[in-house]
């Protein structure tokens, strides 16, 4: 929510919904609203979230409430069966309108394929980004057949946390390149991590082939 709130307006207008969605207290209502706002658009080209389990959860909520969601898209509403604060519903009004043609298209997809996969309801999806390392593969394997990988590039989201984004992946590997121009980094050799007197190194002191732990100071002064 903070990311969507703070991005430049020229980018923000391309999002399917406002940051206020992330302030919906009820988890199920929040996920329903996220997918309801996104599914009304055929031309979604990018889908990004940190944990791939979120992809599965959003698809589950969509499928379990599909007819209700299609009715919402058709009529331009958001179901009253979900607990969404009045002020957030009011803000969402500018993002929704009746789209009977889109609802009909989605029903036709369901009738012809027997399922609702992203490769069918978002045919122009070009980019998917989540974490891809560690045990995230457990979740990834459950939706890999739902995307058209000839059209959609799947990239590691990169080195990111609540406090800041540390780096970005430049290819289809799980490696991240640090953003040295955005934060201040210090490094400690792996062998010194448990030492009470750590030797902190600057980025120009690192040696190729060695392993380090990164300590980050953000623009706001947060040290981690």
Whereabouts are the PLM-identified features?
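Active-site glycine/GP-rich loop and adjacent strand/helix microenvironment
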Residues: 1-224
